Amino acid sequence: MLEGVIRESITKANAKALKKDGYLIANVYGKGIENVNGAFKLNPFIKYLKEKKHLIFPVKLGDKTFEVVVQEYQKNPVTNELIHVDLLAVTKGVKSKFKVPVKHQGTPVGLKNKGILMLSKKRISVECAPEHLPDHYLVDVAPLDVNESILVRDLEKHENVKILDHDSIAVIGVIKAK
């Protein structure tokens, strides 16, 4: 479980001092809970996110424990370093909006025909309760030839999960190389 500290002061000077000490500024919020301003050690946070298996993960700030999902993050445009993260605290049975990653498997037929695989939608917007949240959408791209694509409507349907993206949006496809 990730452990962080609660920020007593939310001033700019306090945030700069925490960043200088190697902390990542975080906000935890959700339906029915009071917003919590916190900070996590940057390197352990990144390592934990890379190793986690599910979108929802536990964090501890002070004496409070939350089940959270990364809602949004900000990176420094020059150094590409993570500088801020918003964590949505989820409650069982309460519907929320999430962004679920798209993963692909297989080698498209179109690559042999001078095509290029284009992942046009990396995340799918969904609405559901946290207990029904899929960890990812897995797409088999092996049958795709040049100028073919997989649309949102072609994705696997999960029970109690409503996809918010329009049906006709391309998720992944093979385009002709120039």
Curated annotation (Swiss-Prot):
Name this polypeptide is given: Large ribosomal subunit protein bL25
Key words of the record: Ribonucleoprotein, Ribosomal protein, RNA-binding, rRNA-binding
Species for this entry: Helicobacter pylori (strain HPAG1)
Statement: the UniProt record of this protein carries the keyword rRNA-binding: yes
Superkingdom, taxonomy of origin: Bacteria
Pfam families noted in UniProt: Ribosomal_L25p (PF01386), Ribosomal_TL5_C (PF14693)
Function noted in UniProt: This is one of the proteins that binds to the 5S RNA in the ribosome where it forms part of the central protuberance.
InterPro entries linked to this entry: Rbsml_bL25/Gln-tRNA_synth_N, Ribosomal_bL25/Gln-tRNA_synth, Ribosomal_bL25_b-dom, Ribosomal_bL25_C, Ribosomal_bL25_long, Ribosomal_L25_dom, Ribosomal_uL5_bac-type
